[in-house]
Amino acid sequence: AWYPGQAGGTAIANVLFGDYNPAGRLPVTFYKSTNQLPDFEDYSMKGRTYRYMTEAPLFPFGHGLSYTTFQYGNASLNTPEIKDGEQVTLTIPVSNTGKYDGEEVVQIYLRRPGDKEGPSHALRAFKRVAIAKGTTNQVTIPLSKENFEWFDTGTNTCLLYTSDAAD
């Protein structure tokens, strides 16, 4: 329940007794043990945070529970490229396959294929949507050019990562 505040007891009871269907997501990674963490004096990012983990954590960044279940369909883009000042729209069909109405937090993680030094993936966008039981919503998430930029240590700036069809 993290830091639930003065109404925390009531909120937790509502979840436990099924009066509220939770949809929150973890803002941090929970490691299985301290053995998964690098030495405290090692300032490398390897093995730290969800973006650099190489082992499976106990609960990853973005993990959450619900009293219902969701199934994702195949995502599609409205265009294969982004021009300056424009956006692409990612559309993902999300179905509520469970017994209860619920909310899902659709999370968009991007990675740079072949990158051995940078993060394995990074959260770039998300959208919380209410989906009635037995229905499918077409969730649309706009992505700008900045969503595809990565920090470059050589120039100390964010640069647009481009790839070819092989990536």
Region spans (language model):
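Short intrinsically disordered coil segments
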Residues: 87, 109, 123-125, 156-157
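Short glycine/proline/serine/threonine-rich loop/turn segments at secondary-structure transition edges
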Residues: 147-160
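Intrinsically disordered, low-complexity Pro/Gly/Ser/Thr-rich segments with frequent PxxP/GP/PP motifs
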Residues: 118-150
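Conserved small/polar residues in nucleotide/adenosyl-binding loops
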Residues: 161-167
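Short, contiguous acidic/charged loop-to-helix segments that flank catalytic cores in large enzymes
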Residues: 1-4, 80, 126-132, 156
